[in-house]
Amino acid sequence: MEAIAMAPRPKTKGLPPGTLIKVGKFAWTQMWHLMMARLAPRSQSGAYQRPASQFRQWVGSEAYPAEAHRYSLIVGMGCPWAHRTLVVRSLKGLEDAIAVVRAQPSPDQGMWVFEDEWEGCQTLPELYQVAQPGYTGRATVPVLWDSQTRTIVNNESAEMIVMLNGAFNAIAAHASLDLYPDDLKETIDTWNEQIYHAVNNGVYRCGFAQTQAAYEEACSELFAMLDQLDQVLTHQRYLGGDRLTLADVRLFTTLFRFDIVYYSLFKCNRRRIQDYPALGPYLRDLYQMPGVAATCDLQAVKRDYYGNLFPLNPGGIIPIGPDITLDAPHHRESLAQRSLVEE
């Protein structure tokens, strides 16, 4: 039987491996810089620059009196800035007076969207348009929303937690708890300024840096401040001494996310918080305060960072770990004599 001759298979034509790598690297680098420019504005040196918040009104003014069931907090559970407001709301006992509306980041739309339609809006940018038609700035969380005037009162978390601490005392279950007392304001403000630059925003300056020099500068400042904080907290329970303050709240929401996402995703990997002799127990101490753990959503944090920051994690794979036990004993009770809520 005559054999059938098979035609030789044509060679696959394509770019040589070296050229393919160069082309792919160039295309991805250009796309990365384009996406990072939208995600994280930068200076000429490649350092991340956080845009200022635009809505800066205050509850307690004539236009916005403190009233129960009038205001809502719009938050994202993964966001550390929004988390601050949830912690203070819980510590002050304002759960029945101020509602919480959850939004979540959409990886496809690149914006915050509501879990359910709210105030006639499906996305946060739509709500910003309701508050200020023609608004062209960033639509961020947290938001303090006034249902009576249908507008945004404030979207700056640093100011919102001051309002939540003091403006709503008439309707707060824990009105006696003062997280921003007059005799500690100077100390609190000093800590807030240092912690914001080096830690709260510092982790973002590491993760969103677009040059090696900008990253190394931010990382050095971050860990220098963490080392300083660890030394201070070796001898006192809180940053204000024996009293919990807003400075602790502002630090807590970054520390809670540190080992989970900032250590790996943002390349803040010189040392974990749980490895610090004072900062690790301090984090557990704050987490175990009444009402605080209920504001923490570990899975949302991992989902929102790893699943939505495409330029930093293009594959969108969410890690299983790390295993962190924040319910473990902290042994810091002996460092303070004053109770959290003075009756």
Write out the residue ranges for each language-model feature.
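C-terminal alpha-helical interaction module
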Residues: M1-E343
